[in-house]
């Protein structure tokens, strides 16, 4: 089996999409290929068909490889709960919460598990494309590294180093990274990749030659800056601003926002613009307000209260439209109780009281794949998604369920999810990916269009669009990189 590892000079240099591109290229060339990231840190996660939790970046990479996402592609997921603590997910299940120092001391225990997981991949795939995290030059973490050079050494993988030229300083970041690696680590790096380039490559070439003279490693290509409709799991996600889009969707950007990949399908609608809101002045009067998921719902509710957004949201709810997802759904209720101090030691807190329901946080985390039908609809309106939450919400007297769940992790069930007020303008659900399917997204956006005097439109199938964008990404990267050299590095062709 062949393997290659993509590392970067920093976070957000484009490692994840380079891995996705290589997965699609190798698949197109007839090889069975699998992505692998030993440890990911993200608040954007996904639930597999067997009810296990993994990072979203490896989900996209799995699709690029033509595979169903599985947790062996991302054995360890860290989900920050505060600046100093994270929830640790190991092989899809909650391992526990820990501080940075506690996890640093834990990492050595996971090495054997990671090696065993990777061995299984070696037995089942022609090529494994690995992804590092952050930078391999974090010299203070070297002795217990399990995600960059430590992982590459564990499975004897060659490394390609990616630098982001769009931020500036790419030559210094590549040379500086190499300077901080030890001799054994330097020998693993077989090439560099310049990512997100704008302009004339001819002007860049003298710099590439000088860089090669300094670090003695060839540049395998320059990938142009390209806007693609593919999800971005990094926390500082920025939505492309459209010059004009008649449908204005505002999203509350809370400090612990999670699973904002729920919005990606909405971004694909040509006449929809999405903007983040962090203050009451920014809210204005959107056509739709979305309160997204949160890794710390109580802290984010306190944030809404302290910054004045709570009152603005309540005022907007008089004639505006609001959808809450997961933590955002919990926020819309009358009360949140935390008897086990899952999030804080407050015990309980009043919600926005826009939906007549209460949430109680439990010790056990719910991680399920679900299929649901929108209630009170004549036409077939099926939603497929997943749930990731600690709380259980209970209805009051003056509330209507939004969905009926009929399938949970492949088993037939029959229970309600979500809620909608009598007026029909405030609703919430626990289902992540609720907009990914055509039916519900088309229904909501068409209702917004009609309200503004616009014509209804058919929504495109998000999965089809994603496949086209992955092919486009692969074409760009194939044209930009020396694929013959890369095949030589991994010992193929």
Swiss-Prot record:
An annotated GO BP: cobalamin biosynthetic process
SUPFAM superfamilies: Class I glutamine amidotransferase-like (SSF52317), P-loop containing nucleoside triphosphate hydrolases (SSF52540)
Keyword terms: Cobalamin biosynthesis, Glutamine amidotransferase
Active-site residue list: 326 (nucleophile), 432
Pathway in which this enzyme or protein is active: Cofactor biosynthesis; adenosylcobalamin biosynthesis
Family from the record: Belongs to the CobB/CobQ family. CobQ subfamily.
Protein's recorded name: Cobyric acid synthase
Record organism: Clostridium botulinum (strain Loch Maree / Type A3)
Biological classification of the source: Bacteria, Bacillati, Bacillota, Clostridia, Eubacteriales
